[in-house]
A protein has these predicted regions:
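S-adenosyl-L-methionine-dependent nucleic acid methyltransferase catalytic domains
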Residues: 1-195
Length: 195
């Protein structure tokens, strides 16, 4: 069923990303376009959805490290949806480079420490322009994934307390936790939920 479909997608996408990684030149970043279906984002906060997690897992398994993400509004809000069609909700560009072959491993605690040290400045960079900010408020939850996953993916593994590698899902949850409601004032919370 669903688990077999996810495994099939992960294997196929990992193979495709391995081919891209083999052809990538270290002097240039690789950009990958990913489009979210509405069904992927319906029941999840931000971008923590199964398809997105599986796609990111394939990119990381291929040996890429993310250096950034850029959300794109490519779909019309008022698009007519036909019966049985998949409507796209939004799109995102991933910017990647090959991960260092001698990349170290870190603990969950060190990963969280790095998130807490780096994400506030990254968020400030995305919002410091006010109305003219480089990232719209509605896209912040997707955009913050770039700096967060850049930290996560630079390592060969982030190890949980039991020594097992942290999953992409857990990493995304920790990154999205930075976006928890209590981190923002009332007006910002309203805007984030409104959009």
């Amino acid at each position: 069923g669903k688990d077999k479909a996810e495994a099939f997608f992960l294997d196929g996408m990992t193979h495709a990303m391995n081919n891209v990684a083999e052809q990538a030149h270290p002097a240039f970043p690789v950009t990958i376009y990913y489009a979210f279906k509405q069904a992927e984002t319906k029941d999840h906060v931000g971008t923590s959805s199964t398809g997105w997690e599986t796609f990111l897992e394939a990119v990381l398994r291929a040996g890429f490290a993310l250096t950034g993400t850029w959300p794109m509004r490519t779909e019309r809000d008022a698009r007519s949806i036909g019966i049985g069609t998949n409507a796209l909700a939004s799109s995102i560009i991933l910017v990647c480079r090959k991960r260092a072959v001698n990349a170290p491993t870190v603990s969950r605690r060190e990963f969280i420490r790095e998130l807490n040290a780096n994400l506030p400045e990254a968020l400030l960079d995305m919002t410091r322009g006010g109305v003219n900010s480089p990232v719209a408020p509605v896209d912040l939850s997707q955009a913050i994934i770039g700096p967060g996953m850049a930290i996560f993916s630079q390592y060969a593994a982030v190890l949980e307390a039991d020594g097992q590698p942290m999953s992409v899902r857990t990493a995304l949850q920790l990154i999205n936790r930075f976006f928890a409601e209590d981190d923002f004032d009332h007006d910002t919370q309203f805007c984030l939920h409104w959009f």
